[in-house]
Swiss-Prot record:
Chain's role: Displays esterase activity toward palmitoyl-CoA and pNP-butyrate.
Keywords noted in UniProt: Hydrolase, Serine esterase
Protein name according to UniProt: Esterase YqiA
NCBIfam families in the record: PRK11071.1
Gene: yqiA
GO CC, one annotated term: cytosol
InterPro entries linked: AB_hydrolase_fold, UPF0227/Esterase_YqiA
EC number of this enzyme: 3.1.-.-
GO molecular function: carboxylic ester hydrolase activity; hydrolase activity, acting on ester bonds
Pfam families hit by this protein: UPF0227
Alphabetical list of Gene3D superfamilies matching this protein: alpha/beta hydrolase
Amino acid sequence: MSTLLYLHGFNSSPRSAKASLLKNWLAEHHPDVEMIIPQLPPYPSDAAELLESIVLEHGGDSLGIVGSSLGGYYATWLSQCFMLPAVVVNPAVRPFELLTDYLGQNENPYTGQQYVLESRHIYDLKVMQIDPLEAPDLIWLLQQTGDEVLDYRQAVAYYASCRQTVIEGGNHAFTGFEDYFNPIVDFLGLHHL
């Protein structure tokens, strides 16, 4: 069994546009690939615990990861800890710096979940950073320079030793994501020969 684990971004949900596009495409073109899109908890330590449990549950499977934005940060951590292939899409490289702007009360607009982000949660996020990458060959960076949320240059520098596709223009949502579905499945090794 092949499994694709999709990790959404900050304050997002499994109903994100990219996740839905990929899920529908897989159902049509690779029905043998199971796609898991967990609702990630707002707190990093809870998210890490959930992701570890998913990986351990699928220990015998061929498992690949796709992560977007904050999900790309988690995907990088998971990839390097468990030696799994990952595609990171406009990933957050230093989210522990960005999320200080969100300290205090927050609400996920997709789920309506309210939560309080505290400095200890930022610390939990920081300890998940892997620098330098231990197995850069396991990661493919998909990056658009027109990302209006994150500085694309951070990702290009951090993932310098990884496979990279850097596209001029675009946006944080990653325009034309569907053009990369076949290469993503190939890179993650999820197709059956």
